[in-house]
Amino acid sequence: MTSFKTIASLLLIILLVHILALINYWYWTYQWLDIPMHFLGGFWAAMAIIFLISNFQFPIQKEFLNQNFLRFTIVILSFVIFIGVFLEFVEFLYDIFISSRGYSGFLQLGAADTIADLFFDLLGAFVFIFIYRIQERFKKV
């Protein structure tokens, strides 16, 4: 499930939908579109981080993946939230330098939107973690 091909394919799908959404103003027409995009982003980030750990022992040792569920979940969610917060800053800077000059609509709709974005990032990551752990359990059987 965490092959490079799967990770790259999901990233390309997310980027394609995101680019189409920006070009066609879907984020402003269909405000709900932001929810599945953040969910998929969190799902992808968790997938990518677990792939990096299991294949390159980056940024932590591979043995970590087999430790207790709570510790594993907290560390993976921490990496995902770091990426999510970084992307919220990117949205903020986009609004300052691009949207404020009239080139596009605003991406930051306020604190509630930011919190919802981060929540769905984490939810997507948690769903992937759950699927990953179930898959790993069945491999051991």
Which residues fall in each region the model found?
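Bulky hydrophobic segments
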Residues: 1-112, 122-141
